[in-house]
């Protein structure tokens, strides 16, 4: 549904969009009749309690208008159509059905000013909530309590909802990049990784801080400094025209010099927008090139099993000459509790 929201403005959860030479048709059922009239732009709205029958009928009408003797070509989003629906649509329906991967996702990579402003608003709400949680203290509280307060605080700060379930991982559990918050209490001398984000006007923020004790152990402090340097190196590489994998390379080179590369187990970053994970990917597998208007994360991390982890993440807007932060919490020094 994200692509339909991007193209039409519809924020509901069930609809089909048909694009043909005759025009754009938005098909949904009666549950969304009023919502679609309020939100949908640039499309004819069709309300039908037999949605897929209506879609089939309109596809057949459109294909009959093609020149005689020439089969119609019907493109569909292959990532978003189940095998069952594909069989339903193609059964007895003449034409060449063409699977198209990511036709809209490619358009969504470059953000307009209004989209960036929405993400900035989401980041402000998320960061404001985090600062309130930190001011109340973490020690002695459980990871679940901190995550719940953080997500509740985002809404009080003006967010529609969290953009994903917050990660709060303390002590040795912070070595799990996607740890689920547990009922474990946060110890006095433990580091805590907090990965969090909010949603405003449909758009997401994504940010990670590593909170360490006021007097951290030397190994934990070295880890933090290594990740901070790697992130700064990655951010300096972000600018229009640079291959995405080049940003990942810069981060890996920095961690390699610090001796932590083998503990970096994921890619450097990803695009953010209406979805929390979008193209492009800042990884060695990516063939994309950064372009003005993209918003990506730069989020190196070091994860040592049995000891703990550190991750630092910001959202960066790509411009011609540099990358500008969309998230605003400072990362040069650790957040100390």
Protein language model regions, located:
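Active-site neighborhoods and metal-handling regions in enzymes and metal-associated proteins
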Residues: 1-337
């Amino acid at each position: 549904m994200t692509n339909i929201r991007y193209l039409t403005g519809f924020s509901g959860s069930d609809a089909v969009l048909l694009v043909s030479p005759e025009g754009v048709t938005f098909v949904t059922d009666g549950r969304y009749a009023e919502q679609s009239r309020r939100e949908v732009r640039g499309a004819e709205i069709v309300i039908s309690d037999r949605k897929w029958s209506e879609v089939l009928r309109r596809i057949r009408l459109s294909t009959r208008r093609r020149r005689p003797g020439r089969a119609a070509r019907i493109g569909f989003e292959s990532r978003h159509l189940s095998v069952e629906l594909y069989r339903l649509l193609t059964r007895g329906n003449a034409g060449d059905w063409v699977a198209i991967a990511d036709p809209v996702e490619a358009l969504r990579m470059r953000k307009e000013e209004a989209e960036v402003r929405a993400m900035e608003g989401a980041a402000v709400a998320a960061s404001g909530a985090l600062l309130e949680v930190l001011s109340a203290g973490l020690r002695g509280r459980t990871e679940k309590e901190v995550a719940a307060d953080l997500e509740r605080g985002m809404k009080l700060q003006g967010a529609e909802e969290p953009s994903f379930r917050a990660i709060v991982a303390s002590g040795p559990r912070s070595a799990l990049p996607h740890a689920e918050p547990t009922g474990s209490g946060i110890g006095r001398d433990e580091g805590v990784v907090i990965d969090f984000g909010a949603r405003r006007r449909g758009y997401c923020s994504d940010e990670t801080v590593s909170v360490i004790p006021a007097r951290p152990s030397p190994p934990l402090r070295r880890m933090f400094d290594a990740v901070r340097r790697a992130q700064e190196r990655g951010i300096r590489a972000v600018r229009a025209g640079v291959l995405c994998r080049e940003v990942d390379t810069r981060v890996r080179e920095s961690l390699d010099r610090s001796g932590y590369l083998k503990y970096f187990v994921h890619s450097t970053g990803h695009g953010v927008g209406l979805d929390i994970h979008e193209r492009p990917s800042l990884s060695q597998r990516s063939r994309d090139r950064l372009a003005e208007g993209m918003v990506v994360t730069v989020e190196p991390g070091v994860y040592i099993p049995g000891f703990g982890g550190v991750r630092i993440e910001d959202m960066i807007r790509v411009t011609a000459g540099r990358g500008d932060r969309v998230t605003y919490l400072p990362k040069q020094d650790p957040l100390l509790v």
